[in-house]
């Protein structure tokens, strides 16, 4: 079975593009938005609606395989690929990537995905945008699965020499800034890893001495115990801090380690990472 056509359409992601540089510089929350001017190239505001590109591969038997090109929240930060805007990258996919796919036999996901992952921009010589690689290889995986009349997990297991799990896999849930109410939802639904919490600002989220995050971890500990159905529910507490500990403690590793020990003690018996 072959790929006959590549179709792209603009979509939205589940979250936002946030200008991390502006947020770390002190941009203040305004509801779901931020007040201030963007500092990272490509941003027209500090928070923008996340954009995606849906890639549809039309197969020779009429089936359609799908993949979604999407980038991370903090696009353009710390050497990451630039802001992923659909209007900029749909033409790019059609001109650069699609010709590499059309007419290809769907015999191996690993082989074709490897080619896409190693593709370089003909003008810059750099690897193509991570969001494109992410979404196009998704579509290839779906296409190979459809060509073999099986599920994507079976294709991965076969080609990479592993087994499809017969047990539920832990899912990491993300609260965004609504870290209290959304944590409740996660606990009530039995999320295995929670809540992310988006601790991306020292003064408003971590606290100048770490006091705000410590208070939140204590609350989270108590909330799990209050809402869980039984003691068998032991979620992992995963907090993303975006380098704020280093800022708050002036990169003093001993102070950071002591603070992390304090957080772990507050989270116990739940594992904190």
Residue ranges and their predicted role:
Residues 1-56:
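Short, Gly/Pro- and small/polar-rich lid/capping loops
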Residues 24-36, 144-148, 152-157, 161-165:
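Extended, Lys/Arg-enriched charged tracts that mediate electrostatic binding to polyanionic substrates
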Residues 39-42, 52-53, 138-139, 152-158, ...:
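Short alpha-helical segments and helix-capping/turn motifs at coil-helix boundaries
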Residues 47-49, 135, 163-165, 231-233:
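Solvent-exposed loop and beta-edge segments used for protein-protein assembly and interaction
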Residues 58, 142-144, 157-186:
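Glycine-rich, aromatic-flanked loop segments that form ligand/cofactor-binding clefts
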Residues 58, 64-150:
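Metal- or metallocofactor-binding catalytic centers and their adjacent structured scaffolds
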Residues 126, 130, 134-138, 146, ...:
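Short, amphipathic alpha-helical segments
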Residues 171-273:
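Metal-dependent enolase-superfamily TIM-barrel catalytic cores that perform enediolate-based chemistry
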């Amino acid at each position: 079975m072959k790929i006959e056509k590549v179709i792209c359409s603009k979509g939205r992601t589940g979250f936002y593009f946030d200008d991390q540089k502006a947020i770390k510089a002190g941009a203040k929350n305004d509801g779901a938005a931020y007040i201030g001017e963007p500092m990272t190239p490509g941003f027209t505001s500090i928070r923008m609606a996340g954009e995606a590109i849906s890639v549809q591969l039309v197969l020779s038997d009429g089936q359609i395989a799908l993949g979604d090109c999407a980038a991370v929240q903090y696009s353009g930060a710390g050497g990451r690929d630039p802001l992923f805007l659909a209007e900029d990258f749909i033409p790019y996919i059609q001109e650069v990537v699609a010709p590499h796919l059309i007419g290809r036999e769907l015999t191996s996901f690993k082989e074709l995905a490897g080619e896409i992952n190693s593709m370089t921009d003909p003008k810059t010589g750099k690897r193509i945008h991570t969001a494109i690689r992410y979404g196009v290889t998704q579509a290839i995986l779906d296409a190979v699965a459809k060509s073999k009349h099986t599920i994507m997990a079976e294709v991965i297991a076969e080609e990479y020499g592993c087994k499809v799990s017969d047990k539920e896999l832990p899912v990491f849930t993300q609260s965004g800034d609504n870290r209290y109410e959304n944590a409740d939802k996660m606990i009530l639904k039995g999320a295995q890893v929670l809540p992310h919490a988006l601790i991306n600002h020292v003064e408003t989220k971590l606290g100048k001495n770490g006091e705000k995050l410590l208070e939140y971890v204590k609350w989270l500990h108590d909330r799990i115990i209050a809402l869980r159905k039984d003691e068998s529910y032991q979620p992992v507490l995963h907090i993303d801090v975006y380098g704020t500990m280093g800022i708050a403690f002036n990169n003093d590793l001993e102070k950071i380690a002591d603070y992390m020990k304090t957080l772990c003690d507050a989270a116990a018996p739940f594992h904190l990472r």
